[in-house]
Amino acid sequence: EKKKKIIGVSLLCVIILLLLCYVGLDLVSQNNTLVDQVVSLMDGQIAKEKDFQIDGYTLENPNVIVNPYGNSPLTALVIFETDNEEEVEVTIKGKDKNSTFTHTFEATKEHYLPIYGLYADEENEVILEVGDTKKVLKIKTEALPSNMALPTSVKADKSKLGNDLYFFTPSSSGYTVAYDVNGDVRWYLTNYALWKIDRLENGNLLVSTERLVNSPYYMTGLYEMNLLGKIVKEYSLPGGYHHDYDELPNGNLLIASDNFSSC
């Protein structure tokens, strides 16, 4: 009878183990369907780019598209043509010099100017300068989400700081956000992204996808995107992504993952 009990317990353990493996593999299988849905996300980006019209738009009357890709609300795209190849200096006015951003774009006739670092729920002043001509834009943005956690205390020695942005990602729920030296939100994603956010050598950001491949925190992979929110690449990993990655000198990525099939 004792042997029968041991055999019975052993069989029960094997059955439980097989069930756990089945559930794990089923989650991975379900993720294949979710990954296919990214195609529609990319199609959505292409559809939005149809609004990026340049014909007939000038420095005096540019095409201004707020949140051009639908997931980065404090950005805009300013589009216009010039008769000659011209440089454009863009200034996004802040509350002080450490929160004001200026950049000069290379000379061209067709100008697609990404605008980052707008304030939420404000008419932002953005100045375009082409030679001796200046155009002041007022770009209105929406309010921040009501469930966004905001800084309660900000201490900064501005004499030792520049006008950098400080990027933060949540470890569970929350928003991927960039703050300026005053603690004001100047950029955020509506996409749910976890773990690390870093800027690649080419200037793009690398963030997690918003889709879970396995509990408790394995995401399907990573998105490479620009600050406007345009996804330029997706890296899908059979073992998911969690916590950390690193860009190697040769441009390859070293990513923390797992092997769900090992069970």
Where do the PLM segments sit?
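N-terminal Sec-pathway targeting helices
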Residues: 1-16
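Polar/charged alpha-helical tracts
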Residues: 2-6, 36, 40, 230
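Hydrophobic alpha-helical membrane-insertion segments, chiefly the h-region
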Residues: 15-27
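Extracellular ectodomain segments of secreted/surface proteins
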Residues: 26-83, 150-155
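Histidine-/acidic-rich catalytic cores in large beta-rich domains
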Residues: 64-79, 84-92, 112, 116, ...
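Short beta-strand segments within Ig-like beta-sandwich modules, predominantly Fibronectin type-III
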Residues: 102-108
